[in-house]
Amino acid sequence: MVSSTRSEHSFAGVGGVRIVYDVWTPDTDPRGVVVLAHGYAEHAGRYHHVAQRFGAAGLLVYALDHRGHGRSGGKRVHLRDLSEFVEDFRTLVGIAANDHPTLPRIVLGHSMGGGIVFAYGARYPGEYSAMVLSGPAVNAHDGVSPVLVAVAKVLGKLAPGIPVENLDADAVSRDPEVVAAYKADPMVHHGKLPAGIARALIGLGQSMPQRAAALTAPLLVVHGDKDRLIPVAGSRLLVDRVASEDVHLKVYPGLYHEVFNEPEQKLVLDDVTSWIVSHL
């Protein structure tokens, strides 16, 4: 199998914050670029196996650690506005485009990263060729009481660092080794979800139907039907609202939130890789 070589780089993000990103370069001539956004509390390194699978198909991978995450600068998991994440991601897409101007660009996001990629894609629809979302946080307010939504919005604006919600690490995967590694990873944030990020995701969910109308590029959404962190209902709603005529939702029975880290990960990665290659 073709392997990819990983290298570390950085750029100045919004407000001058140092953003660290990795590039996985396949050993053969690349035929496409995947620009990847990880989820809340984690980091790009958790996608090494994903990048290797894509590399075997001749795909370059660019993946950043969001501000306040992993190796990047900024206060831990602190966010004032979703646009900070979106514009940092856009900078990375621009770097990939400058490095490889003739290659098609696929943008991919998981969970919160899926929300970031969705928001980016809706705002800048002409900058990429296709989009892949994994368990995307595009409907985070669904099922939350109006009172809690209002509280999160106020706190998120006035005191974005205040912790408001615990996330269940056992819900990321059915694989106990994945869960154990997640819990032991020093670059994963193990505290509560802060109000700033909660506010950003709630606002994104409330504006999702309007934003979705701007998505015209091919879209693949993958989701586990036993995802307790980001229920699949949001993905179903998203694919019904996008303007694109090339939309596919793949729901995997029994899988939890991180479909790339489930025991069935080979099946999922093969499906996603095949779809990407078919859209180059």
Swiss-Prot record:
Disruption phenotype: Disruption of the gene affects the morphology of the colony and impairs growth in the presence of monoolein. Cells lacking this gene are more sensitive to rifampicin and more resistant to isoniazid. One of its GO terms (molecular function) is monoacylglycerol lipase activity. The keyword NADP does not apply. One of its GO terms (cellular component) is plasma membrane. One of its GO terms (biological process) is fatty acid biosynthetic process. It catalyses: Hydrolyzes glycerol monoesters of long-chain fatty acids. The active site is at 111 (nucleophile), 227 (charge relay system), 257 (charge relay system). Its EC number is 3.1.1.23. It comes from the Bacteria. Optimum pH is 8. Highly stable from pH 6.5 to 9.0, and still shows a residual activity of 50% after 1 hour of incubation at pH 4.0. It is found in: Secreted, Cell wall. Transmembrane segments: none annotated. Its main location: secreted. It holds the Pfam family Hydrolase_4. Keywords: Cell wall, Fatty acid biosynthesis, Fatty acid metabolism, Hydrolase, Lipid biosynthesis, Lipid degradation, Lipid metabolism, Secreted. The keyword Mitochondrion does not apply. Contributes to cell growth, probably by hydrolyzing exogenous lipids. Catalyzes the hydrolysis of monoacylglycerols (MAG) with fatty acid chains ranging from C14 to C18, with a maximum activity on monoolein. Is unable to hydrolyze long-chain diacylglycerol (DAG). Belongs to the AB hydrolase superfamily. This is Monoacylglycerol lipase. It comes from Mycolicibacterium smegmatis (strain ATCC 700084 / mc(2)155) (Mycobacterium smegmatis). The lineage of its organism: Bacteria, Bacillati, Actinomycetota, Actinomycetes, Mycobacteriales.
